[in-house]
Amino acid sequence: VITHRVQYLTKEYGIDPGDILVITFTRAAAEEMRERYEALTGGGSRVTFGTFHSIFFRILKLAYRYTADNIVREEQQMQFVRELAQAGGLEPEDENEFAASILSEISSVKGERIALEHYYSKNCPDAVFRQLYAGYEEKMRRAGLIDFDDMMVLCLELFTERKDILSAWQRRYRYILIDEFQDINRLQYEIVRMLAKPEDNLFIVGDDDQSIYRFRGAKPEIMLGFERDYPGAGRILLDVNYRS
C-alpha cells in the first residue's frame, strides 16, 4: 500500500521524491519497502525510507554531531541497572530479568511522556524505581550515551526549542507516510505531528488489532483517534491482505 501510494504521488501529482519520507518500525521493513518501490519504478530513488529511530538519529547527528559511538549498547544498559540495584541493596531473584523489566519501564516513561512522579512501577516500590531511573540517567549522561528513547526525547526538545531547525525539516519532508501506525507511541506521534505541519500531508497504514509493541508503550488508540486530530482525514478500509 505504502509503496504504491509513493508511486502515485510522484507519477500522478509530480511530487519530488526527495520531499517524501516513509517511516516504519524495523530496518527490515524499511529496506523491504525501499526494494519494492525501486522494483515498481525501475531504479533508485530519492525517497527516504527509514525507521523512527534512524530518522530521528539522523536529525540529531546533524544538530549535535552525535555518532554511533554515542548510542548505548543493550548490555551497557543492563549493567547500569544491575550496578544501581546492587548499590541500593536490592536483591532480585534474577538480576538480568529485573534489569530488563526496569529498562522496559524506563522506556515506557519516556515514550509515553509520563511525569515520573505519576508513574507506578510494576517491579519495585515507586520510590526505588525513581532512584533507579535517576541513577540510570546520570550514568548515561556521564558516559555521553543516549538510548533509543533519548533519540526521540532529544528530537522533540530540539524541534520545540529550535523552530528554525523544525522549519527546515518540515520543508525537507512535505509528505510523510507511516506503516504499522498502530505501533506508534505518544512521543513518536508528537514528533510526527510537529514535522508534518503546516501542510499535514500524512498518510498512515495500520491495523489496531495487530499492535506488537504494546510492551514498549505502543498505543493503538492513537490511531483510533487520528480522525479526531485530523478532522479532514479520509479513511479507506482494506479487506484484502496485500502481503500474502
Regions flagged by a language model, labelled:
Residues 44, 65-150, 173, 235-241:
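ATP-hydrolysis module of ASCE/P-loop NTPase motor domains
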Residues 56, 60, 107-114, 177, ...:
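Short alpha-helix boundary/capping elements
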Residues 1-70, 167, 221, 233:
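P-loop NTPase Walker
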Residues 21, 29, 48, 73, ...:
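Conserved helicase NTPase motor core
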